């Protein structure tokens, strides 16, 4: 009976240790940039800044590439996409992008990282 308990205990510890290891390798690469232009419009100085970023996420053999862009203007006009982020995503091995929800593609942590410049 004692050897049975030892065997069960050894198997339980082995399963717990193995389950703690990731089954697939995950790598992440994030870039960010900010560019601003200043201009004079109707007697007022205005600025327009573009926040952009990319996220390459590889999990095992699956790889996605996401692009984030957000324009912020000091004097928005009715046609601007002010404060609305635009995101698109593709496979790392393709250049055919589809629009995606930014929160789904990047997550709040990476969006905050890109916008805090």
From Swiss-Prot:
A Pfam family reported for this protein in Swiss-Prot or TrEMBL: DUF1505
Cellular compartment(s): Secreted
Annotated InterPro entries: DUF1505
Domain of life of the organism encoding this protein: Eukaryota
Tissue-specificity statement: Expressed in the uterine epithelium.
GO CC annotations, alphabetized: extracellular region
Keywords: Secreted, Signal
Signal peptide location: 1-20
Function recorded in the entry: Negatively regulates the egg-laying rate by promoting retention of fertilized eggs.
Family classification: Belongs to the UPF0375 family.
Protein name in the entry: UPF0375 protein Y45F10C.2
